[in-house]
Amino acid sequence: QRWTHVIKSFRIPAHWKIWRGYDFGYSRPFSVGWYAADEDGRLYRIKELYGCTGTPNEGLKIDPVEQARRIREAEENDPMLKGRVIQGVADPAIFNESQGESIAQMQEKHTYYLVWHPGDHTRLAGKMQMHYRLAFDAEGRPMLQVFDTCKHFIRTIPNLVYDESNVEDIDSDQEDHIYDECRYVLMENPLSPRQIQKETA
């Protein structure tokens, strides 16, 4: 597990905290990522649900309630997640009530009962947390590792590039949905840069 970000899956200990990150999408993919935190604060992306047609950056066009059903189904059918307390953090936009019932309200009131709290959408701080997490320490261990079953994370994250008009940020016209939901979870578990001893190559 050293000097790598992608690792084989393993059974998550029962006492590890589980997070669920969510970026809503309709014509673009929605993204859900489940993360486990170990005793050292290291995060593992252990599972994902990506609402994509198979064509990059093309969403399934399914409504918020159907997305909630699929999220709940994924948790009920996974031994690592079934029966666990899971903290949900999502794009703050799903709490918008300006046009009626919010997406968060729709997903909470149905039998699938998904409860979210709004993630920190500060883009620069979130990008820095991603850098801190992916950096290797002196022993070759990053603070974010990804199970090799998370194919869409592995496909999309390395392809992200900076915004030409704002080089401090990622270009949001890309397939950045996994990046966004990951940021929300990372911002709930912030690292200090002084904990990082060696940058990634």
Outline where the language-model segments fall.
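ATPase catalytic-site recognition across NTP-hydrolyzing enzymes
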Residues: 1-24
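Mg2+-dependent endonuclease catalytic cores in nucleic-acid-processing enzymes, primarily RNase H-like
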Residues: 41-171, 190-201
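Acidic, Mg2+-coordinating catalytic module of metal-dependent nucleases/exonucleases
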Residues: 172-193
